């Protein structure tokens, strides 16, 4: 199993509020996307990722289904504690998406709209589930998936770490053999690059170069947000 990654500030933003962490040996991968003024978003995303990774590494045995909630709660509490000490950061928070690969299983969890995709030879499947206004509208049939991609409120999220003690968690298990690769990313990629283009890049580009090509494509389409990608060869 190999993993390669890249993060980029994008075209229009001054600061990069995304964060990523990879633990190759234990097959644990994190992407977080912070929000909040006064550079607070980049603090929130870093706290979340580092808190989760440290907690993960301390565990002798990791049961994703039962333990991932505890990791996310720890990350949430760490951000809230930081805000209590640094009141100028009030209002900051972060999304997070996590993937964990065991012998046969692929586990994914997320809070917010950072995503994980499963890549096969002929398809790209979103494995995570967005906590966002447009996702709710799609779910109740008010708008189509295609309309959601262009919706003016597509950046409004309905769950995040560091905002409140209560937050939504989505988690799911897949058969690892169903996919050749997984892609974790912030919405700076998913809002700018279509699934068809992602699949084309995975098909034609050398694995080591995929993160750069994905980031370059997002920037070529406008680069309206920070862009972070983690590509894992299963």
Locations of the language-model features?
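PP2C/PPM-type serine/threonine phosphatase catalytic domain
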Residues: 1-234
